[in-house]
UniProtKB/Swiss-Prot annotation:
Gene3D superfamilies (UniProt xref): Periplasmic binding protein-like II, Porphobilinogen deaminase, C-terminal domain
Pathway entry: Porphyrin-containing compound metabolism; protoporphyrin-IX biosynthesis; coproporphyrinogen-III from 5-aminolevulinate: step 2/4
Lineage: Bacteria, Pseudomonadati, Thermodesulfobacteriota, Desulfovibrionia, Desulfovibrionales
Function: Tetrapolymerization of the monopyrrole PBG into the hydroxymethylbilane pre-uroporphyrinogen in several discrete steps.
The enzyme's E.C. designation: 2.5.1.61
Assembly information from the UniProt record: Monomer.
Cellular component per GO, a single term: cytoplasm
SUPFAM superfamilies: Periplasmic binding protein-like II (SSF53850), Porphobilinogen deaminase (hydroxymethylbilane synthase), C-terminal domain (SSF54782)
Note: The porphobilinogen subunits are added to the dipyrromethane group.
Record's protein name: Porphobilinogen deaminase
Modified residues (S-(dipyrrolylmethanemethyl)cysteine): C241
InterPro entries for the chain: HemC (IPR000860), Porphobilin_deaminase_cofac_BS (IPR022419), Porphobilin_deaminase_N (IPR022417), Porphobilinogen_deaminase_C (IPR022418), Porphobilinogen_deaminase_C_sf (IPR036803)
Any Gene Ontology biological process: protoporphyrinogen IX biosynthetic process
Amino acid sequence: MKKIVIATRGSKLALWQAEHIKERIMQQYPDSFEVELLVLKTKGDIILDVPLAKVGGKGLFVKEIEEALLDGRADIAVHSMKDVPMELPQGLTLGAIPEREVPTDSLLSARYDGLDALPQGAVVGTSSLRRQSQILAMRPDLEVKWLRGNVQTRIRKLMDGEYDAIIMATSGLKRLGETAPFHSELGPPLFMPAVGQGALGLEYRSDRQDLAEMLAFLDHRPSRICVEAERGFLFGLQGGCQVPIAGYAVMTGDNSFELTGLVAELDGTAVIRRTAAGTEADARDTGLTLAAQVKAAGADAILQRVYENGHASPQA
């Protein structure tokens, strides 16, 4: 029986995602493979006392995992697509993208039922400049406070009273079955998700054609098309996952989609949003074109201010 090693981070959510892919492989190929997990710590897991946007560098949550692929310790890596840099290391490729989980964000609170119920000056926790900029655009009277840690840690801090509300990805909450006394979704078109949010991606060495064929059953074409368009938009802006950039594509037909991209000032005082239509064949190019439109509307100046003020680094 052939052994397959899946590299993953050690958080509860990352382990859930890796176990999910492991189970799918074993269901598809019963008695064909022995599947093991290789649990690794990444830079993003180790540095917990600094906001992610200020840590800098590419691939905060993937670099160590990619090294395991390149040196042969692992065969497959399971990533949250929002954490995957636009440019992969030489010798690696992104293969199947399984069906995407809901891409929205969620507002959790112990006392307040939704964004409108938060009192003036309420403290909202998030680790994301994208979430910060959008929540302040909707409610400039709120105070945004830095929040790091895994899903359970963040919810514990909320319940301990450190925050009046926190914002987290809905997909992670659903996968782990976590919530809070009050839970409301923040989603498109009012609140835009990160590029690739809710989607998983499988990475492996480019010379492993056997893995490309073996994992093809996991690929969900609509999810792949949409994520490819979103990543084209992010690449066109030379942005990483720790910047105030949002992008979300939705299928409008079997081969067509609509992509919306957003860049916002950190204090929410300016929000640039544009939409474009595309097809599977030009998914990435549609994202690049939309990025150029957003740049022309002022996004370049906004992102430059973010970088100059040390809030984030390009291509994080």
